Amino acid sequence: MWPTFKGEEWDKGMDQFAEQHFMVLDQFLPPSVLETVCRYFASVEAEDRLKAAAIGPGKERTRISEIRSDFVHWLDRPLMTELETFFDGMDAIRAAIAESLFLSLRGYEFHLAKYPKGAFYKPHFDQFNSRENRMISVVIYLNENWEPEHGGALKLHKPQEILIEPAMNRMVMFRSDTV
């Protein structure tokens, strides 16, 4: 695991997650990893590889712009060697989460998302009704120079309504089935 989250801060976050089903950690990615991910995202944008986001699992996936209007780029580890350090770190963090919370977390999927001005994703659970394999969702914000007037705060609805500002390098983790 990256040295950023070992010890007391990580333990406090895991305790918060166990009690409230979410946690927030700032300065999540080490600087070199953050720089690599931001550079990769910039290349995805420059090469126009972001696609209109859809909802639903697998073959049921469909675009419904009244529910979700952002753009995404799915990350495929074998094809993205420049992100290997990111994936290696997330492997270690997945293992640490599984150990701390006594969960069987076998895999993960990642995508980059862009929300242009006015874009949205209506309230929803990240776990699909038809499948229970998505247990935990993680959001890592890459917003440089974010200001409140830019909008885009994440609203968690359970256990109580909480607004989380999308500050650069902030990680939000929450249960996919309850928050």
Which residues are covered by each model-predicted region?
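Fe(II)/2-oxoglutarate oxygenase catalytic core
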Residues: 1-137, 141-171, 177-179
